[in-house]
């Protein structure tokens, strides 16, 4: 299938089996890059930020849940958060409404909205997003 030109590459995948067994295995550039990512995560205390800001974000989503009867099951860990809506149609309405106001969310499952912000998100950015989500919910009820 590969033809004779494959033999022009000394360490091709057919001569060096480890070339095919893993996307990241043995890739020096990716190992160096990953080391830098881990150092940044540690130096900038991104795990701690995700825990602290995530708890704040979840509290805000629970407040939204008390205001908007269609929202239920606000949940999450760190900054990976979600809530449910009654059905896929309602979820699509909320997803589009949030998007049109500039709040980027993800669809999850059949009826969930998911949040997956950057690990360095600030309380100010969450406040801004929550203000827009409250605005959508209020407009929707009119």
Region roles according to the model:
Residues 1-142:
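Conserved N-terminal phosphate-binding loop of PLP-dependent enzymes in the Aspartate aminotransferase
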């Amino acid at each position: 299938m590969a033809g004779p030109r494959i033999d022009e590459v000394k360490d091709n995948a057919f001569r060096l089996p480890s070339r095919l067994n893993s996307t990241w295995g043995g890739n020096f550039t990716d190992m160096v890059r990953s080391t830098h990512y881990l150092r940044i995560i540690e130096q900038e205390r991104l795990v701690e930020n995700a825990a602290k800001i995530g708890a704040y974000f979840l509290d805000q989503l629970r407040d939204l849940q008390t205001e908007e009867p269609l929202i239920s099951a606000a949940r999450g860990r760190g900054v990976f958060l979600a809530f449910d809506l009654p059905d896929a149609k309602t979820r699509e309405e909320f997803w589009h409404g949030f998007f049109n106001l500039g709040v980027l969310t993800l669809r999850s499952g059949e009826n969930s909205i998911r949040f997956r912000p950057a690990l360095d998100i600030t309380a100010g950015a969450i406040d801004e997003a929550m203000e827009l989500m409250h605005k959508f919910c209020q407009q929707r009820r009119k």
